[in-house]
Amino acid sequence: MKKLILLLFTSVVFFNSHSQENVSHTSKTKVFLLAGQSNMDGRGDASKMTKQDKKELKLAQNNISYYYKGTTNNIKEPIIIDGVLDVTDPWQYVKKKFRIEKCFGPELFFGIELAKKYPEEKFLFIKRSEGGTSLYGAWNPNWTLEKAQLKKEEHKRKLYEDFIETVDSQLENLQNGSYEIVGMLWVQGESDSGNRYGPLPTETYAENLTSLINKVRVHYKVNDLPFLLLGVGSNKVISKMKETSINLSNVTLIERSFNSYDENFTPRYNHHWNGKPANHYNYTGMKKIGQLFFENYFKFYSNYIK
């Protein structure tokens, strides 16, 4: 009888310690923030996804919750996804322009790779994006009417403010202490490139990006929050991203290539729409972008997921 009691006690102790070990490893939901313009929105053609892609997405959906708010010009109602990681049913003009029915952004294959590497973890992705928007104007954390007017964005939403409100509203659904913010992905820069509206958007890009990063970190009380930038836009804008990544800790610039021989090759659509190149990253390009985000996060910041 004493042996039986001892055996039961030992089993209970082992079970409890084993359960606590699992809880300590998986108890907190890991939150990623995503923001930017149309290439963060994503135009990757979901119909090109392979059977293996779909299988891996289905597995990732067990681990990754996903909230997405996307807006666009002249359409009042946003696209909202509030569920698990998935592809997007976009606006009709996007379907026509890119000859697609459904699409995806960097989050999809970033999430697929993340779930494969961390099958025991739970994640929440919160994404806020709007195409054709600048950091100088709509995304500026130090928004002014004058800056917005310079970029013809005075009638657009104050996107930094809206981004914070969107993230806050989703975090309020979680219990205090049940989550930790472990990274932010930023895909934006095209609208600050060129000289159509003068040199200021490009010249002040590093200053505005630094302000955005610092304000996000302060607001969410994560002073060393990993911040990953995709190098998009003009060479001058990308050089400003590089400058920011050198001057701030835990900021990584992800370089992509249009050379098909490079490992970081990110091809774009090659057809025209209304007499202009459609541009934007296609299935292969957007898939690679998601994978590049994961590779860089895992290389530099894997210690944030424990």
Name what the model sees in each region.
Residues 1-21:
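Bacterial Sec-dependent N-terminal signal peptides
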